[in-house]
């Protein structure tokens, strides 16, 4: 669970994330099993390398204080359709029958970033509803770092 903390932590910071080491201190850290006070999270090269109390950080580490905050592991969304927009905004028929695949992908990029910033580090995306294999391309773009988004488990 600890490896899923990073994307949730990064959601609190301005994008893009810095590659320099980062020592993050919050009031509490939930590691997926227990709540801890006085713990820190050390991130290096985009990866969590240590979690615990009184961590030794490199001299050049950026120090991020998050008073009053609780750090959590990333959430997993078990049923998503990143290539669909809410039906109260655009009907299913209009999206699937009238919108271009390119337009739907552009909107899915926005949905992917919003999902990540909400703390969801993994989504199980259950199909594109008429956008072919666009979810495969979106997953690849996220994995290669072209766009921010959660890890995608796709069902195409």
Task: Please describe what each predicted stretch is.
Residues 27, 41, 46, 68, ...:
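Divalent metal-coordination and catalytic microenvironments
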Residues 33-72, 142:
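Histidine-rich, glycine-flanked metal-binding segment
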Residues 4-16:
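Bacterial N-terminal signal peptides
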């Amino acid at each position: 669970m600890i490896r899923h903390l990073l994307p949730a932590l990064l959601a609190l910071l301005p994008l893009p994330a810095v590659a320099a080491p980062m020592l993050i201190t919050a009031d509490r850290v939930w590691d997926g099993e227990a709540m801890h006070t006085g713990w820190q999270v050390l991130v290096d090269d985009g990866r969590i390398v240590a979690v615990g109390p009184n961590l030794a950080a490199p001299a050049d580490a950026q120090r991020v204080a998050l008073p009053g905050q609780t750090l959590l592991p990333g959430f997993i969304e078990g049923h998503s359709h990143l290539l669909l927009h809410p039906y109260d905004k655009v009907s299913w028929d209009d999206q699937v029958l009238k919108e271009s695949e390119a337009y739907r992908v552009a909107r899915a990029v926005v949905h992917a970033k919003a999902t990540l910033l909400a703390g969801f580090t993994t989504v199980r995306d259950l199909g594109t509803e008429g956008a072919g294999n666009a979810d495969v391309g979106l997953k690849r773009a996220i994995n290669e770092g072209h766009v921010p988004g959660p890890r995608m488990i796709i069902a195409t």
